[in-house]
Amino acid sequence: MALWMRLLPLLAFLILWEPSPAHAFVNQHLCGSHLVEALYLVCGERGFFYTPKFRRGVDDPQMPQLELGGSPGAGDLRALALEVARQKRGIVEQCCTGICSLYQLENYCN
């Protein structure tokens, strides 16, 4: 009985100290099935959307053509292509390559 009385305050402390799920989820790398599970956790019944990237063809009008020669303006096109690539970061680049938070994952919910 004396052991139980000593452990009771410790048990009460552990129960009260348990972090909430929002605090338990820190910014982290999420890849593959871990990323999908995190999206299910964050989005719940709303669900989430995913549009897989397809391989861009040479004539894709959304991707600026790069001039590899030394013609004038080639540097401008390279800078534009790099800027477009930076703006089109997907969830994998954001959460797997980098780290993301619950708030960033919520951007992918329906």
Swiss-Prot record:
GO MF annotation, one: insulin receptor binding
Single GO biological process annotation from the record: cellular response to oxygen-containing compound
UniProt xrefs under InterPro entries: Insulin (IPR004825), Insulin-like (IPR016179), Insulin-like_sf (IPR036438), Insulin_CS (IPR022353), Insulin_family (IPR022352)
Cystine pairs: 31-96, 43-109, 95-100
Assembly and interaction partners: Heterodimer of a B chain and an A chain linked by two disulfide bonds.
Family: Belongs to the insulin family.
Name this protein carries in UniProt: Insulin
Record gene name: INS
